């Protein structure tokens, strides 16, 4: 799996700036429940072809009386679940008592730690890092996060020190699970019924292996079989004993969710019907869309709602999830089992759509019909031309469209084409990505050369104009 890198340090040393440089995002996932994450940011970055997950732990306190008292418990949890730690210090202020306490705490963790000296722009790097050798965390690495200097070299250095073996657990899982098994990640906010749903699915089917260690620290991979087809459920909340299925709060980790989506073929996103779609739900949906995984929506706790309440919930879903019209919605009760059995069929259809072969002749026919029904707009008096299309990838399906001036194609027209391809090909349950490529004009910048006959005709016309 992707390595998890935690950014640790005192307040105002530049952790958030470095986070934004590494991920080019400010996305924060907030859990509205006491004791859960409130101030951490999560993002995904990539160096070359190697992705990684970054956690910004926020300020860890400036109290020299003791690190344990100054640290937030959630920041400690982030350090605990990280595979590597970037310890940021301020190169302008030099090491402080709090830095020394933090360094001592990190040394006890037994994890790879890189000492990163930020704010070294405009100063001699050797002088800026000299005092930090006393922290006992190896060679300090100077950067200037605000200007992006030294960050590429830093990440090359960090990832070189992390073995590719982070993917070995996933590979081992593929050996253990049944051949061709569909991996389903059950994700959602705390207390929406994820574990109840997992246990309901397992209670209805024959469990081949009940408890298999997963690739994430608390997620569990559970193979099962239904109608002769193998599946693997990924429970991001961790497997519970049956006596504890009714816990009031499920364990919640963004890291688990991101890793589960990476390992899965299809994601079942569980939403609490009684609370509707929250901001945290939309953040999770954003992560699913970014991952490109096929998606099924499970609207849980449907039982007990009156007819009016159900209509209100459906109206809210239509209003807030207009961008998610490709995902099938299933109204279920994980506690009582109503509607749960239909989820497997929805998963199969979504995965089939995500993996489908899209013949080029059919794509070109659909493109031609779409352009004939609604032509692209004019740009500076010239019509944007879409020439041909072909498949560029699967899971999610990628359709590559070639033409001229495609960079100027409006977003509304791109969405129109996406809807046309989805409807015509029945690609529901999976995101569809369109890529537009402009063909180079070999005659650009060249003037047509006139033939001798054309030159004589031009001279005659010029003489007539002069008269």
From Swiss-Prot:
Name the residues that bind GTP 2. 188-195, 235-239, 300-303
EngA-type G domain span: 3-166, 182-355
Q: Where is the KH-like domain?
A: 356-440
Recorded hits in InterPro entries, A to Z, give: G_ENGA, GTP-bd, GTPase_Der, KH_dom-like, KH_dom-like_a/b, P-loop_NTPase, Small_GTP-bd
GO MF annotations for this entry?
GTP binding; ribosome binding
* Disordered as annotated region, ranges: 439-467
Q: Where does GTP 1 bind?
A: 9-16, 56-60, 118-121
Q: Which GO terms describe its biological process?
A: ribosome biogenesis
Keywords, A to Z, come to: GTP-binding, Nucleotide-binding, Repeat, Ribosome biogenesis
Q: Looking at the Swiss-Prot or TrEMBL record, what is one Pfam family this protein matches?
A: MMR_HSR1
Q: Where is the composition biased (Basic residues)?
A: 448-467
Q: Is Aminoacyl-tRNA synthetase included in the keywords of this UniProt record?
A: no
PROSITE patterns associated with the record: G_ENGA (PS51712)
- Function, as annotated: GTPase that plays an essential role in the late steps of ribosome biogenesis.
Family classification = Belongs to the TRAFAC class TrmE-Era-EngA-EngB-Septin-like GTPase superfamily. EngA (Der) GTPase family.
- Subunit info? Associates with the 50S ribosomal subunit.
Protein name (record): GTPase Der
- The record lists the organism as Alkalilimnicola ehrlichii (strain ATCC BAA-1101 / DSM 17681 / MLHE-1)
Gene that produces this protein? der
């Amino acid at each position: 799996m992707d390595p998890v890198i935690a950014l640790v340090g005192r307040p105002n040393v530049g952790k958030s700036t470095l986070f934004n440089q590494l991920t080019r995002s400010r996305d924060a996932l907030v859990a509205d429940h006491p004791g859960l994450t409130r101030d951490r940011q999560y993002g995904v970055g990539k160096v070359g072809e190697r992705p990684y997950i970054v956690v910004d732990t926020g300020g860890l306190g400036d109290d020299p009386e003791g690190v344990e008292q100054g640290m937030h418990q959630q920041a400690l949890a982030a350090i605990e679940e990280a595979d590597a730690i970037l310890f940021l210090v301020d190169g302008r202020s030099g090491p402080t008592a709090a830095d020394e306490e933090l360094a001592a705490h990190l040394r006890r963790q037994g994890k790879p730690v890189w000492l990163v000296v930020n704010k070294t722009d405009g100063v001699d790097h050797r002088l800026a890092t000299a005092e930090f050798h006393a922290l006992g965390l190896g060679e300090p690495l100077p950067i200037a996060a605000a200007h992006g200097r030294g960050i590429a070299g830093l990440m090359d250095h960090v990832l070189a020190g992390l073995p590719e073996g982070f993917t070995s657990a996933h590979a081992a899982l593929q050996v253990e699970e049944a051949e061709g098994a569909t991996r389903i990640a059950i994700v959602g906010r705390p207390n929406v019924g994820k574990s109840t749903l997992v246990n309901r699915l397992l209670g209805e089917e024959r469990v081949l292996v009940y408890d298999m260690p997963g690739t994430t620290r608390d997620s569990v991979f559970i193979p099962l079989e239904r109608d002769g087809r193998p599946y693997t459920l990924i429970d991001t909340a961790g497997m519970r004993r049956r006596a504890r299925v009714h816990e009031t709060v499920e364990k919640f980790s963004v890291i688990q969710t991101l890793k589960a989506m990476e390992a899965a073929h299809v994601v079942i996103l569980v939403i609490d019907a009684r609370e509707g779609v929250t901001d945290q739900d939309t953040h999770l949906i954003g992560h699913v869309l970014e991952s490109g995984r096929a998606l099924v929506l499970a609207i849980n706790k449907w039982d007990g709602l009156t007819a009016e309440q159900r209509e209100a919930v459906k109206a809210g879903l239509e209003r807030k999830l207009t961008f998610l019209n490709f995902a099938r919605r299933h109204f279920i009760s994980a506690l009582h089992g109503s509607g749960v059995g239909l989820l497997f069929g929805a998963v199969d259809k979504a995965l089939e759509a995500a993996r489908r072969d899209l013949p080029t002749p059919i794509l070109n026919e659909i493109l031609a019909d779409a352009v004939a029904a609604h032509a692209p707009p004019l740009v500076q008096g010239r019509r944007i031309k879409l020439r041909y299309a072909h498949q560029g990838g699967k899971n999610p399906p990628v359709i590559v469209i070639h033409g001229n001036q495609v960079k100027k194609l409006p977003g509304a027209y791109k969405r129109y084409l996406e809807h046309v391809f989805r409807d015509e090909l029945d690609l529901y349950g999976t995101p569809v990505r369109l890529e537009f490529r402009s063909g180079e004009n070999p005659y650009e910048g060249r003037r047509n050369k006139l033939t001798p006959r054309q030159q004589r005709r031009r001279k005659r016309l010029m003489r007539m104009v002069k008269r």
